[in-house]
Amino acid sequence: MKKSKFLKVFSSAMALSVILAGCSTSNNSSSKNAPKAKVEFKTEVDNGGSAVDGATLKYGILSPTPLTGMWNPIFSTQATDYEVIGNIVGDTFSTDDERKVKQDNEDDPVKFHLDREKKEITFTVHKDLKWSDGSEVTAKDIVATYELMGNPKFKENARYTNAFDLIEGMKDYHDGKADKISGITEKDNKTVVVKYTEIKPSVLFGEGWISNVLNAKQVEEASKDFTKFAEADLNKKPLSFGPYVIAKEVNGESVLAEANPHYYKKDDVKVKKIEFKVVSPAQASSVIKN
C-alpha cells in the first residue's frame, strides 16, 4: 500500500515574521485613529485522509547548526538538541496560560505542591510512572537530580544559579562544605520535600527548583568522572519516563524516537515513531517541495 507523505518540515523554529513600520511623526488624528490591519495565521493544517498505521512522522528542525547529541533534558544547552529531547520526554509539570506551574495536579508525572507558610515544595511521583527500562521512578531519582545540580565537582554546570542557594543547605553542598543537601528530605518512596529559606514569586515560574527528573543510577555513574560527563549514558542514552525513547541516532543529522512501552499514558501516544532531522535554511524550500 502506498503511504501518504507526511509534512517534511514541522518546527517551532520556523515562523513567518511580519514587520509593520510606522514612518510618520505627524499628529494627524486620522492617522492615529486609522484601524490596524488584522493579520491571522492558521495554527492547524488538515490534509485530510486517515493516518497510516505504523508510519513515521517526519519532524524537521530548521537550523544552520547540527545536533550535538546532548540528550539530557536538564543540561542540554543547544536549542536544536532540546527541540528533540523536549518532545521525547514531554512535560514533567503542567503549566497554565501564564506559564505558571499547576499545583496539586494528580495527573502530572510529578505532582507539585507549594506551602508558602512552611517554605516548602513537595514533589510526589505518580504511582504508575516508570523509566523506559521498566523500573519505577522514585523519590531517589528526584534527590539524585538535585545532588547533581549542586555537585561541587560539576564545574561545567551552566544551569546552576543563585536561585538554588535558597534551598536550605544547597550552598554549603555546592561549596563542598557538606556531603548532603540538608533541606531536601526523602519523605517516602514517592515523595520529596524541599525546604527553602525564602519563597519568591518566581518559584511558580520554575526558578529555584528543577523541572525534570533524571535516573538516579545514571546520575551516579555519570558523577564518577566529570571529565567524561558529556559521554555518559545519562546524556547520550538517557532513560525516559516520557512518551518516547531514542531508538537510533545519526550523529549531527537525525534522531529516530519510538513510543515508550512503559509510558504511564501509552494509550495516548498515537504516533509510534518520529524522525527528527535538522534542515538547513538553504535546503528548506526544496525539502518542502519533495
Model regions and ranges:
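Gly/Pro-rich hinge or "lid" segments in bacterial periplasmic/extracellular proteins
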Residues: 208-269, 273
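Aromatic- and charge-enriched surface segment that lines or borders ligand/interaction sites
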Residues: 110-160
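N-terminal lobe/hinge region of extracytoplasmic solute-binding protein
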Residues: 58-116, 239
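N-terminal low-complexity, Pro/Thr/Ser-rich intrinsically disordered segments
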Residues: 32-57
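Sec-dependent N-terminal signal peptides of Gram-positive bacterial secreted proteins and lipoproteins
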Residues: 2-26
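Bacterial lipoprotein signal-peptidase II cleavage site
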Residues: 23-35
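Surface-exposed binding/hinge segments that line
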Residues: 159-221
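Extracellular/periplasmic solute-recognition and catalytic clefts
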Residues: 61, 247-258, 275-290
